[in-house]
């Protein structure tokens, strides 16, 4: 099973990883961090080269932390992916390009302003062609209620998780 773990460094994104770790020991987890500059007002001009460099540094710090968390949870570490730009577009493009089985993310990120502009996780749920796991808070329960639309994809993910 291939999982795309999406993180902006927020505690909630790492809660998603912790919540599902018990169920995905055999999965390979690729981690994507997208620094989304689309929230900047159009009136603000930036030096794109320096801003891209800063974005890359922030993404590297977040990805380093994510790698440690994945290792500490005893999970199989995959690739690191970093992008600057639209989080929604980057996540959807990556999930389709690499044919992941599951997108894993927190319900909302670090930026409170994004709640006003629209939720990345909500758009991923609505637009993704694969299964998604969205977490709100850490939960150490060993019971999970899976909902499915009956598609082969949904059933295969459940099969992978319970095997």
Each predicted region: which residue ranges?
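Structural beta-alpha unit
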Residues: 53, 68-103
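General small-molecule cofactor/ligand-binding pocket signal
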Residues: 30-32, 78-83, 133
């Amino acid at each position: 099973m291939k999982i795309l773990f999406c993180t902006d460094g927020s505690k909630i994104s790492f809660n998603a990883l912790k919540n599902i770790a018990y169920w995905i020991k055999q999965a390979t987890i690729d981690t994507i961090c997208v620094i989304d500059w689309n929230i900047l007002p159009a009136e603000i001009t930036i030096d794109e080269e320096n801003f891209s460099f800063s974005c890359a540094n922030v993404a590297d710090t977040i990805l380093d932390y994510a790698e440690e968390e994945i290792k500490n949870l005893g999970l199989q570490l995959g690739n690191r992916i970093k992008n600057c730009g639209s989080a929604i577009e980057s996540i959807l493009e990556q999930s389709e390009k690499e044919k992941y089985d599951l997108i894993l993310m927190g319900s909302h990120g670090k930026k409170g302003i994004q709640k006003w502009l629209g939720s990345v996780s909500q758009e991923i749920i609505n637009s993704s062609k694969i299964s998604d796991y969205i977490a709100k808070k850490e939960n150490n329960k060993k019971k999970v209620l899976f909902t499915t639309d009956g598609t082969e994809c949904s059933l295969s993910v459940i099969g992978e998780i319970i095997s």
